[in-house]
Amino acid sequence: MPWLLSAPKLVPAVANVRGLSGCMLCSQRRYSLQPVPERRIPNRYLGQPSPFTHPHLLRPGEVTPGLSQVEYALRRHKLMSLIQKEAQGQSGTDQTVVVLSNPTYYMSNDIPYTFHQDNNFLYLCGFQEPDSILVLQSLPGKQLPSHKAILFVPRRDPSRELWDGPRSGTDGAIALTGVDEAYTLEEFQHLLPKMKAETNMVWYDWMRPSHAQLHSDYMQPLTEAKAKSKNKVRGVQQLIQRLRLIKSPAEIERMQIAGKLTSQAFIETMFASKAPVEEGFLYAKFEFECRARGADILAYPPVVAGGNRSNTLHYVKNNQLIKDGEMVLLDGGCESSCYVSDITRTWPVNGRFTAPQAELYEAILEIQRDCLALCFPGTSLENIYSMMLTLIGQKLKDLGIMKNIKENNAFKAARKYCPHHVGHYLGMDVHDTPDMPRSLPLQPGMVITIEPGIYIPEDDKDAPEKFRGLGVRIEDDVVVTQDSPLILSADCPKEMNDIEQICSRAS
């Protein structure tokens, strides 16, 4: 998608424990990267799949499919290590991180959208219920990154669970996620006085709160009070994004699964595109094939653009008829176990490229191959983008689309026919870690897209008539490694012969 430039041992009720941290149990608890072994998942349904209720999805010790309690604890540990570096020179200052979940959003009265968790919150704990708060607190007398992780979650409520389904509650939250402590959401207010203290640095994204109501009820008064303190509230999102930028082996495995199943969905959608065909049918076919193979949802509204509509980069109406002889550009991806894919392919719906279509398609395919070869440590998306524009400029000259263009104007001319970047970071979000600049040197573990395109509107009088109305983009998902790049979407055909064979395959 183009991107514009154990039965848990709970702490006693807060009413009996001033400030959440003064009880005997808290002082005796061991805080470490290892989950407490005696915490058993409650033998009931929680607010999300668990190894007890969904053994076909999660192994024991996993919080979300493929990701263990230890992995989530390590993420929190790494975040507190970054905060330790940021807070150097602030000896005697407590550090507290606050991350809010998403709320439930509604399309109309009493009709909710499917809930999707805030990805920064999800990245740090794996908890998938709305109206929750994650707190990471430094420990008195211990240096960072030592800390304790606390979840504040919705209270068990039989009347609401009758309508909305089960909630994890404090016992389920602590056992499933492996955090150190869990309380009901209402008990968060008892933590606020400590955070308001002069000796406490709070890390919280008050400029872009993910949950407006929780921000208004709890965090806005805190940020206003801290504005008068020497230790003001500092944003934490960029630190989390720095961690999310480099994927672990477990994350890459999740993304490989998403890439493979999306590739298979593309193959089946290509096969189903017999001309004439409605864009809406291909949309439905693609979504069905993703979901049938285990995807949770689509990663974004797909672009299913036939003919000249492929020149609208984020065309998502998907309601027109694609005629015999036209190509379709399908930009689609899925979300599987919290990680997404993002793939684009362009093909003729009748199964045969015309000569002009083949010329333009082969030009983009060559450019994409050259850009993929640049996906190695030390280069950057900006470097690859510059190379893409150079290559596009040369191809536009070769095809006779750009004439009499001086070398110093080639970039500008190339941007006319490819107004988007070469790619973006990919992970839990499609346009992942948006605060991270594309000038960063690539490192092993980064996942990016490479998606050159050429778009020639049907009213472009400068281009040869045979190319007018054609738009081609080819997009793959790439893991940067120490060696050659790992293409997560390698199973998705893009050679012209392969595409034509699939489209002409017998039913």
Curated annotation (Swiss-Prot):
Name of the coding gene: XPNPEP3
An example Gene Ontology CC term for this record: mitochondrion
Protein name as catalogued: Xaa-Pro aminopeptidase 3
Listed cofactors: Mn(2+)
Protein species of origin: Pongo abelii (Sumatran orangutan)
Similarity section: Belongs to the peptidase M24B family.
EC number: 3.4.11.9
Molecular function in Gene Ontology: manganese ion binding; metalloaminopeptidase activity
GO BP terms: proteolysis
Residues that bind Mn(2+) 2: D331, D342, E475
Superkingdom assignment: Eukaryota
Chain residues that bind Mn(2+) 1: D342, H424, E451, E475
Major localization listed first in the record, in broad terms: mitochondrion
Region (Interaction with TNFRSF1B): 54-79
Residues of the transit peptide: 1-31
